[in-house]
Regions:
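Alpha-helical residues within the helix-turn-helix
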Residues: 32, 49-50
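Short alpha-helical segments that sit at the start of domains
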Residues: 1-13
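A short alpha-helical element within helix-turn-helix/winged-helix DNA-binding domains
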Residues: 25-35
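Short helix-capping/hinge SLiMs at alpha-helix to coil transitions
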Residues: 18-22, 68-69
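Beta-hairpin "wing" of winged helix-turn-helix
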Residues: 51-67
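Non-DNA-binding regulatory cores of transcription-related proteins
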Residues: 67-134
């Protein structure tokens, strides 16, 4: 996983939030801590909010907070919310005209889809609270 990916940012942020789940954090505070731009943070956290992992409040005392207890947020929840696939499935490729290439593409695509399913299953076995060691 790339250190600057949206997934890394989301997991890092949620892990910190799990340490004090009732605390509200601003995009600017999160961005400063993560060493990135607040706009990037808002985009990533917006996806997590859409997935029901975070809530947000506007205004002077506003910010972001966990929508669930940390034990109820798995790494798979975060991964799926961001729609940032680690395993490229090859589903977007054109159908090759060569029958050998077509069969090869189909089989490799099936293997990659199996890997993706296994990855999501394994990510689902670990919660954000476990990442923190709490």
């Amino acid at each position: 996983m790339k250190r600057n990916s949206r997934l890394s940012l989301a997991l890092h942020t949620l892990s910190h939030m799990a340490g004090d789940p009732d605390r509200t954090r601003t995009s600017s505070d999160i961005a400063e801590h993560a060493g990135t731009n607040p706009v990037v943070v808002r985009r990533v956290l917006g996806r997590l909010r859409e997935a029901g992992l975070l809530t947000s409040e506007k205004g002077h005392a506003g910010g972001w907070r966990l929508a669930r207890v940390p034990e109820a947020i798995t790494l798979a929840d975060v991964y799926l919310a961001l729609d940032e696939r680690i395993v490229a499935s090859g589903e977007d490729a054109d159908t090759p005209a060569c029958s050998v290439e077509h069969e090869l593409h189909k089989r490799v695509s099936n293997v990659l889809q199996d890997i993706e399913r296994s990855l999501v299953q394994k990510l689902g076995e670990t919660s954000i609270s476990e990442v923190r060691g709490t």
